[in-house]
């Protein structure tokens, strides 16, 4: 049980998500969100979310130490920190922590702070930490959570004013034809209100997506208003002009993910239903030139199996990070034309085997993001360390264009769980339906609920 001094500190300082960014303008920026456990679970660990994707459990004493350091760092937001300033902040954080732990030597607290920060930076940058770090899966932590770690914001609808509202018409679009994907779009002020509500709900990461989010004239304003969050933009890249990229960089967008189906213009254009290859490629170049962290995403099918060539092409554009997937079984990807291009397990394994050889050669990073398409042992044998599992109502949720809350960004045909503008967050999160979907995800059985485990619920209107 926490001591009296620890309980007092928690009541005053640790009831909400805390956030700092180290080296914000550098290539090795480290975003740290410290997420408290439920108030009725005082012995549960705090959870650190590093750069929006790495999870680290933290005990209470180190959470208090880190919170005190965050308090000292906050006044320096956007400023360059000298070595003397850094040491002064660390000393002040140690002194404040000593008030909660008066029988612990300040030298020990200082050593702990240094070890913790060094280790967190190492983990965030994919390096080996000095400290021993425990392993914590979301399945183990699910009962302590009060919100997902990421909310995907579908800023733009697939249809608007009765007409198609996207500058592409992708063969495998997960949103096309789903009822909530065509919902009326919210205004700028309504999305700004939602960002405030998401922060109050302790959700540390948002993704701006669509449809095509760059069709929104207020995109930069919304990204700028979301600087407390880890932010990502999912786009087809056609509208990523040098001017827009510079503004997004100035608004502190953390990363941009561009969908590139192939290095072959004809294949890419056939799959996106538009003559967009050159604009997408130029958009990638513009984003890289602006200093944005860029990743390329490729849904894999029988028409773009030369994925190794796509990775080489992406690397030539300055891209280091890549993701690929099977076809999400929703929207247009449920149609006969898309289904006919789905890869067999053997074919997909061959594509990934060739891809892994290329990323190893070029020093790129590759993740496969579709749960249930390949067995875990196959993915590990290929050298893929991320084993995807369904995150619906657990690690991630999404908002439709009208603010409707849905289990994930592909879950656009069933009744919403609520609306972010009008419903109390706790009542949505703790509702029987949301809890049931979360319980399925928490099994961590590496199956997409729209594909297997909860298909009936996903199809229910």
Describe each PLM feature range.
Residues 128-150, 370-378, 417-436:
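Short, charged low-complexity linear segments at domain edges
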Residues 159, 166, 170-173, 390-393, ...:
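Short cysteine clusters
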Residues 2-13, 30-37, 254, 261, ...:
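Radical SAM enzyme [4Fe-4S]-AdoMet core and its adjacent flexible, acidic
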Residues 5, 9, 14, 404-461:
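Flexible mid-to-C-terminal extensions adjoining Fe-S/redox cofactors in radical SAM and related proteins
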